[in-house]
From Swiss-Prot:
Record-given protein name: Uncharacterized lipoprotein Lin0239
Lipid attachment in record (S-diacylglycerol cysteine): C23
Residue positions of covalent lipid attachment, annotated as N-palmitoyl cysteine: C23
Organism: Listeria innocua serovar 6a (strain ATCC BAA-680 / CLIP 11262)
Topological type in the membrane: Lipid-anchor
Cystine pairs: none
InterPro entries tied to this protein: DUF1307, YehR-like_sf
Amino acid sequence: MKLLKKGTTVLFVMIMAVMLVACGDKEESKTFSLSQNGVDSKLTYTYKGDKVTKQTAENTMLYTSMGIKTKEEAEKMLKETSEKFQNIEGLKESIEYKDDKAIETLEVDYTKISSEDLKKLPGMASTGDVSKGISMKESEKMLKSQGFKEVEK
C-alpha cells in the first residue's frame, strides 16, 4: 500500500513539473507604435521567453508624405519594393491602396524564414547574429531608441 501511495505521489510530482515547464514558455506579445513624417507604424512582436517567433508590421503612409497625390502614383512608387518581399518562405507582405494613403502589412514568421533571406530584406534592422534568433529584449531596446512607444494592452 505504501508503495502504491509513493508511486502516485511521484507521478503527481512529474505531471506538475511537466505542466509548470509547459506554462513557463507561454507565448506573449508586445506592440509598439511610431508616427513620423506622415507614416504611422505599428509593430507587434510575438515571443516565447526572450525569443521572437513572429513580427507583424502595419505601416500607414499618407500620399502627401510621399510627395504624390494618387493611388496610381503610389502603386508605381511602391511596386518595386513590394516585389522584393514576395515569394519568401516565412514572409507575407501586402499593400492596400486607399484614396489618400497606402497601408502595408508585413508579417515575418521567424520559425520559417531563413537567416539569409532575413538579412536581404530592405528596411530590416537587427543587431547580432540573426541565425541564433531574435531577442525580444534587444528588439525592444532598439525600437525605443528609435522613438517607438509601447502600446499598453
